[in-house]
Swiss-Prot record:
Homodimer. This is Putative metal-dependent hydrolase OB0782. Gene3D superfamilies: dinb family like domain (1.20.120.450). Keywords: Cytoplasm, Hydrolase, Metal-binding, Zinc. GO terms for cellular component: cytoplasm. The keyword Cytoplasm applies. GO terms for molecular function: hydrolase activity; zinc ion binding. Its cofactor is Zn(2+). Possible metal-dependent hydrolase. Belongs to the metal hydrolase YfiT family. It comes from the Bacteria. Its main location: cytoplasm.
Amino acid sequence: MNEKYPIGEFQFDGEITNIIINEWINEIEDLPRLLKNTVIDLNNEQLDTSYRSGGWTVRQVIHHLADSHMNAYIRLKLAITEENPVIKPYDEKEWAELYDYNLPIEISLSLIEALHKRWCSLLRDLSPTDMERTFKHPESGSISIGKNIGIYAWHGKHHLAHITSLCKRKDW
């Protein structure tokens, strides 16, 4: 198994249908529960273990998910309310070194739970036309809301797999 990409990299070149969108939204909606159930019994030593050599710790992954998904939510709102807005990327590696990534995971778990409720509520209210709206990432180009939903459904599963595969390898 590839420890960096335990579920593979995001790939989707097909037609983004309502069925696929709903599956992706369900995956985003399920992440807070799955994440909490996976990490709730881990101790500080386990939380401060890297999921792979040179990778983030479990604690950093959890805080990263909160930061990344907050950015996704804001990008969604920008794409809904503006015409192909240019979004500001951030340096996730630098953010992972900031002090708040040392805080208890419960803070980010609560944030992720609340954020995903709002995010999924908004996503479920979008029309098929809304799904085609885009934002422009300076490095990746224009991305539709529909595709971005898929990216973030994958993103949550990707990082959850980092944690679950570590737990399995360590027999936690």
